[in-house]
Amino acid sequence: AVHSMKDVPTVLPQGIAQAAVLKRANYNDILVLKGTEEFFGQPNAMIATGSLRRKAQWLNRYPTHKVVDLRGNVNSRLEKLANNEWDGAVFAAAGLERLGIRPADAINLGWMIPAPAQGVIMVSCRDNDAEIIEATQKLNDYETQVCVGIEREFLNLLEGGCTAPIGALAYVEQKTQEINFKGI
C-alpha cells in the first residue's frame, strides 16, 4: 500500500512493515493568498486551515488574526477559499505540487514547522512479504527514512497522532552531514 507518511500511525499494526520511504518532496506549508499580502498588517485578518498545528503556529506569530476551520480535499478547500471572505489558506506544499495546482503567488511559510513526515510517501506491505520488501528497496531514500524516523519518534514520545498540534522537522545539513532537528 502507498500512504502519505504523515497520516500513518507511528506504531504500525502487527503484521505490517514499512517497505520503503520515498525521497521527501517539499515539506513546507504554504499560504495561498486570496488577494494581496497587505492583510498581514491588518489586526483582523482571516486565515483558513484544518490543522491545529498550523493554527497554533499562525496565532503565535499573528495573535490578532482569526483562524477559521477548513476541511475537505484540496480542490474543495481551494474553492472554499475563493468563495469566502478569508485572506488566505494554509496548505501542505507537496499536496498542491503533486497535483500540479500550486498557485504562482503562494508564499512559503519557512518559519512554520511542518507535521512529522510531511511531504513523504511510504510504501507498506505484509511483514512476511520478502519479495515486495526487496523490490521496493530500490525506491527507498535512506536520508529521508532516517529523518522521518526521528520526526516520528518525537511524535511517538509525545504520544501524538496525525491530528495533534505537533510539528517536527529533521534534515541533514549538507555542509556538515549532521542531522538537525526542530520540534514544537
Residue ranges and their predicted role:
Residues 5-64:
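A conserved helix-loop-strand patch within extracytoplasmic ligand-binding domains
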